[in-house]
Structures are given as structure tokens and as C-alpha cells.
Amino acid sequence: MQVKHQKVSIITDDGKSVEATAPIVISASRRTDIPAFYSKWFINRLRKGYCVLYNPFNQKPSYVSFKKTRVVVFWTKNPKPLIPFLCELEDRSIHYYFQFTLNDYEKENFEPNIPKIQERIETFKQLSEKIGKEKVIWRFDPLIQTKDVGIEELLRRVEYVGNQLKGYTEKLVFSFADIENYRKVADNLRREKIDYIDFNDRSMFQFAKALFVLNKNWKLKLATCAESIDLEQLEIEHNSCIDGELIKRIFYDDKDLLHFLTFGKTTTNDTLFPSDTPEKSINLKDPNQRKYCGCTISKDIGIYNTCLHFCK
């Protein structure tokens, strides 16, 4: 049984009654960097109780209510602007954790509008100390090979960052750039005269084997994001970035949340696990993601083409 988001009625700012999706888990956001550029917007909409999304093709509005939200997963390359507002989520008993992408492509200027790498490393450490290392997941994503940046150079850069993040996170997630399947990215790199090299099974395994050795020092969980290649022999798993098992582990005292992740629905009962049992095996996998994505169902509240990092 595929779990679906609940629907509720809300009153909009202009007094209209409309139907809204009321997700348990919010993704903020795969589509844009809300913490870096839209923290105030996010908090203002949280205070209002809902946000509006517009269909990019016909501009038709749809509404997302925060009435039942228990967890927000933030995706970002710079969470610093959001940090002062985290107390507002805590005051509303809304849990959260971060997918923090911390790459090192400064020389190549692939991410032209992000802070310098040392500043990002310090922000990572500060956030980890504030909310706990289990809630800040390090992403080196994607791994990009070029004529000048081969496997050894990528490993050197990952090692440099990893050595500084030791003790400040529990997990490293990475993916291999599949540039030829993303025409816009390929066109951008060609325009910049960047000679990129797509990964193959041999180069992916070469990188993963060396990363396995580096990780003997860090002792992190290693995982790939939406990759088909099997690297389990190197103790590298397929990731769930919006991770139901992680949510259960770190927010174990939220009975409604645990009930949703077990039965596919929330409960207002006082007992942790009421007598009802699922009639069928529930499917919490997000049906709107790629084939090899293991994410738990969520609702993304970002808008495409609004990210100001201007990544190539």
C-alpha cells in the first residue's frame, strides 16, 4: 500500500477556504537552497501555517499545510542564514536535520556563489555543535571528473574536508556526476570550456575503494545517492537522504511520528503503538523520485530555478 499525504482545509491570507496537502515530512528543498536564500520566507510561511507552490507549466497554485508536519529535512550548501531561526521549529515541536553539501570545487568555480570552503567547514562545525552531529549529514555531491580533476585529486579534496569534519558528522553521502544525462549541465560545462569525464564502473569502484581506506580514519557511514552500482563489499550502502530509519532513531520520543513510519498514518492516542495493525505492507518510498532513490515520502516546498548559487 503506497502511503499518500493527507488533505486538510485551510484559510488563506486573503480569507479563502482551500484544500491543502498536509505532509508529515517536508523537504526543504531538493529544488533550491531554502536555508541559504529563503530562510525568512520559510519562517514567515511556517508562522502562517501554509505555503503556496505554483505549477511551472500552467502556474496553477497548490497549497501545503504545516498542520501535521513533524520533520523538516533541509538541503543546503550554506545553512548559516537559517541557524538563528531553528528555535522557532523547536518551539513548534517540529524536528529537523540537514543534508549539508560541502564540496571543494573552488578552483573550478563550479559553485560560484557559495562561501569559501573554510567558512563552510566552520559553519558545518558550528551547526553540528548546536544541534548534534547525527543531524548534520555531509554530502560531497556530485563528484565531478574533468581533464584536470581526476580520481586522485577528488580523493585529495574529499580527504581534506573529511579530516576537518571528523567528529562533527556520522555520515558521508556522495554521487557520481552523470553529466551526459543532464543536457543543461553538459551545455554549461561545454560553454565554460570544461572538459568533463563521465564515470564508468571501473572509475566508480576505484574511487570507492580509496574512500573506504580513507574512512578507516573517520569511521563514518558511507552511502551513495541514487546510484545503481553495488558497493556493499566496501561497506558503502545505498542511501535514503530523507531517511525513515534515521528519523526513527533520532526522534524516537515522538509517538505520532513513529506511528506514521510504522503504520503509514498518525494517531492521537496516548499509547505508542495502538492495537491497530496495518492491513497490508505499507510503502513509504517516495514515488516521485528517481529509480534508485531510497527516500521516504515527503513534500518538497522549493521552486525550481530560484537557487542563487548559480552552480554550473
Q: Where is each model-derived feature located?
A:
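Substrate-binding surface in catalytic domains of secreted glycosidases
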Residues: 174, 191-212
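Conserved C-terminal portion of the radical SAM core fold
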Residues: 119-186, 210-229
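A C-terminal junction/extension of Radical SAM enzymes
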Residues: 202-294
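Short, surface-exposed amphipathic charged segments that create phosphate/polyanion-binding patches used
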Residues: 113-115, 186-189, 237-243
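Short, solvent-exposed loop/turn segments at secondary-structure junctions
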Residues: 33, 79-80, 103-105, 143-145, ...
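Surface-exposed cleft-lining segments at the edges of enzyme active sites
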Residues: 106-114, 142-152, 190-199
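Local cysteine-cluster metal-coordination motifs and their immediate loop/turn environment
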Residues: 291-312
